[in-house]
């Protein structure tokens, strides 16, 4: 029948299996087999109704088969309702993705100021440490010590070294031995005593002079030994050679 042609092969095979018929063959064979089975069933039912009802049974031509076609059409029309649910769910998924992206962006923006504040704090600490060091170097105590050392160097006619004076002033402030004062006193004592000055010059001259060679010892001769000399003389007489003095 015409309504079987609109069905799929799988549906046709299901109907044939329900009726106990063979499901082998292509779609046309399945449709023809199914229509033949339905026609035979309809004939049997009509015959039974005719025997039961007699003249009250309607003829086959008066049976309206349009209701069955409408049923199949209504089922076909109602089937494409599923993709609509998928289409409606797609915008909802897109909205959820947009919300997730917005939350990620908000987290990144909230974390960015924390890193900037950490860099600013580090910069402030470095500036404070530099300022504290400069305050230590330029404190009034260090300036006073520098002035004292400069005046002392001028008094004894010693050349002034700014870097050495700074180190000595810093050492005096923290209670460390002052290398500048000790070196200045040493130079002053050497310049004041001429004997010390001459001794230092002689020491310097001795350092620069080449080392003196040790006196060479006279090589010992074998003939200096009287025993060895006698042996040599006898050997010379034996071989007819004149003995060496």
From Swiss-Prot:
GO cellular component: nucleus
Residues with Phosphoserine modification: 139
Organism, as annotated: Schizosaccharomyces pombe (strain 972 / ATCC 24843)
UniProt cross-references to InterPro entries, sorted A to Z: SAP_dom (IPR003034), SAP_dom_sf (IPR036361), SAP_domain_ribonucleoprotein (IPR052240), THO1_MOS11_C (IPR040746)
GO annotation, biological process: poly(A)+ mRNA export from nucleus
Protein name, entry field: Protein mlo1
Secretion signal span: none
PANTHER family: SAP DOMAIN-CONTAINING RIBONUCLEOPROTEIN
Biased amino acid composition, Acidic residues: 58-70
Pfam families referenced in this protein's UniProt entry, alphabetically: SAP, Tho1_MOS11_C
């Amino acid at each position: 029948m015409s309504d079987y042609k609109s069905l799929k092969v799988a549906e046709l095979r299901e109907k044939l299996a329900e009726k106990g018929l063979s499901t082998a063959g292509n779609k046309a064979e399945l449709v023809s087999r199914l229509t033949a089975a339905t026609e035979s069933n309809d004939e049997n039912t009509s015959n039974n109704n005719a025997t039961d009802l007699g003249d009250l049974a309607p003829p086959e031509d008066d049976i309206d088969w349009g209701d069955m076609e409408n049923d199949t059409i209504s089922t076909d029309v109602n089937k494409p309702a599923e993709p609509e649910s998928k289409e409606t769910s797609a915008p909802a998924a897109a909205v959820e993705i947009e919300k997730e992206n917005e939350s990620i962006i908000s987290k990144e923006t909230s974390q960015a100021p924390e890193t900037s504040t950490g860099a600013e704090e580090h910069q402030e600490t470095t500036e404070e440490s530099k300022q504290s060091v400069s305050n230590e170097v330029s404190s009034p105590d260090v300036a006073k010590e520098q002035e004292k050392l400069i005046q002392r160097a001028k008094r004894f006619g010693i050349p002034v070294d700014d870097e050495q004076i700074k180190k000595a002033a810093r050492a005096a402030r923290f209670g460390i031995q002052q290398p500048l004062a000790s070196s200045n006193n040493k130079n002053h004592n050497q310049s004041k005593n001429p004997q010390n000055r001459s001794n230092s010059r002689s020491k310097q001259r001795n350092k620069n002079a080449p080392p003196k060679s040790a006196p060479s010892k006279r090589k010992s001769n074998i003939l200096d030994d009287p025993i060895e000399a006698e042996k040599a003389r006898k050997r010379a007489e034996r071989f007819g050679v004149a003995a060496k003095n």
